[in-house]
Amino acid sequence: MHYTSWDRSDRTKPVLLAEDGPEQLGVFSENSAEVDGHFWRTEVSDLGASATLADGSIYRLAGRPGRDKRLEASLNGRTFTFINENSGDWIIDDVDDEKVGQFTARNSGVRKAILEFEHDAEGLTTAEIAGLSWFTGVILDANTQGKAWVWIITLVLASIVALVALFVL
């Protein structure tokens, strides 16, 4: 598999696809997922994200997804690092600093959250591919939400200044 992407036609239950589909790797909701026929309990907070798999394995993303430029991921003891190279471009390195994959927020990167793998994801299980892909979506969503708040506050302040200028001057 060269990459994963998301089908977000149902916003409450995005579907993780192998490449552009039709093969589905998993279906995610706010607090759970079904990946490769197995239940996952998922949680996202300001300090990271975690998924507890049916067999008790834990996948964890440590750091502030909307702010940090470097996040550490542990997939049941297997370590990966998400590194923001510049603005919206990210890479994923393994413990040996070998590039595993990359993704971007540019173009339709946030909507599809495409995670491209090096060497066709060789050496990664379906669960690990799904975990890294889910963390990619968490990071992109957190960055989008942070930028949305900046725009909202800017527009509110600009509106107040415009109203003051209109009625006072």
Predicted feature descriptions by range:
Residues 134-169:
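C-terminal single-pass membrane-anchor helix
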Residues 1-132, 137-140:
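Cationic, beta-structured binding surfaces that engage anionic biopolymers and membranes
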